[in-house]
Amino acid sequence: MFEITRPPGVRAHVGVIGGSGLYDPGIVENPVEVKVSTPYGNPSDFIVVGDVAGVKVAFLPRHGRGHRIPPHAINYRANIWALKALGVKWVISVSAVGSLREDYRPGDFVVPDQFIDMTKNRRHYTFYDGPVTVHVSMADPFCEDLRQRLIDSGRRLGYTVHERGTYVCIEGPRFSTRAESRVWKDVFKADIIGMTLVPEINLACEAQLCYATLAMVTDYDVWADRPVTAEEVERVMISNVERARRMLYDVIPKLAGEPELERCSCCRALDTAAI
């Protein structure tokens, strides 16, 4: 159902999708830029394939280098397809988020376990537009195995890592109104807010990839009666990004093997999804 032609001679095992602030593929050694063609057009940028402690890693800046693609205009299907085409099994998505809780502070990390989709149906949510259709289960949308590895990595490094959280994904590119922010916080009971998780996570599930998000808290959303500015977000992001790099260096060598089937069902996501 998901037929992929891999670029000759290039393979990767772990994919890293860099979000706001993490555009630099300098996390890998022996980097090679790879252009991957997909049925859905071009990914956000060239994919840089290289090594981290002997593990082949494919790095893709979600917004393109220089942050030139806004959240609603990202070609999510091409991005996920391209990583799958390179042979990737694990995908670590790094994202900047706002906090909807006092105890999730700027500078903290969150490894979310749930999401709420508040995008506006302007994005492409599936690879299966017909005649084949699938209905993947999203009851527990993130790879629990990969989530736990990220949590363990953050703790080894002494960082504040919140091991659960509900991510509400809004359309963007604007930030929330104060009324909206209070709805996400008080009515939806969400914990963090961002603009890029959906449909990236849906597509990763359809591609049967192990996917988890490392969310970097950059600000309290405007429920806290403080306006959010791009300058504020960028200031916190600079310090967060270096710590995110250290987490990637720590966790990627531990992903050298295949996903463990007893801990993860991601590679079987389509087994019962077709009707």
From Swiss-Prot:
This is S-methyl-5'-thioadenosine phosphorylase. The record marks S176, A230 as: Important for substrate specificity. Pfam families: PNP_UDP_1. Substrate binds at M195, D219, Y220, D221. It catalyses: S-methyl-5'-thioadenosine + phosphate = 5-(methylsulfanyl)-alpha-D-ribose 1-phosphate + adenine. Its EC number is 2.4.2.28. Gene3D superfamilies: Nucleoside phosphorylase domain. Catalyzes the reversible phosphorylation of S-methyl-5'-thioadenosine (MTA) to adenine and 5-methylthioribose-1-phosphate. Involved in the breakdown of MTA, a major by-product of polyamine biosynthesis. Responsible for the first step in the methionine salvage pathway after MTA has been generated from S-adenosylmethionine. Has broad substrate specificity with 6-aminopurine nucleosides as preferred substrates. It comes from Aeropyrum pernix (strain ATCC 700893 / DSM 11879 / JCM 9820 / NBRC 100138 / K1). One of its GO terms (cellular component) is cytosol. Belongs to the PNP/MTAP phosphorylase family. MTAP subfamily. One of its GO terms (biological process) is L-methionine salvage from methylthioadenosine. The lineage of its organism: Archaea, Thermoproteota, Thermoprotei, Desulfurococcales, Desulfurococcaceae. Keywords: Disulfide bond, Glycosyltransferase, Purine salvage, Transferase. InterPro entries: MTAP (IPR010044), Nucleoside_phosphorylase_d (IPR000845), Nucleoside_phosphorylase_sf (IPR035994), Purine_phosphorylase-2_CS (IPR018099). Homohexamer. Dimer of a homotrimer. Phosphate binds at S20, R62, H63, S95, A96, T196. Disulfide bonds join C143-C210, C205-C266, C264-C267. GO terms for molecular function: S-methyl-5-thioadenosine phosphorylase activity. Pathway: Amino-acid biosynthesis; L-methionine biosynthesis via salvage pathway; S-methyl-5-thio-alpha-D-ribose 1-phosphate from S-methyl-5'-thioadenosine (phosphorylase route): step 1/1.
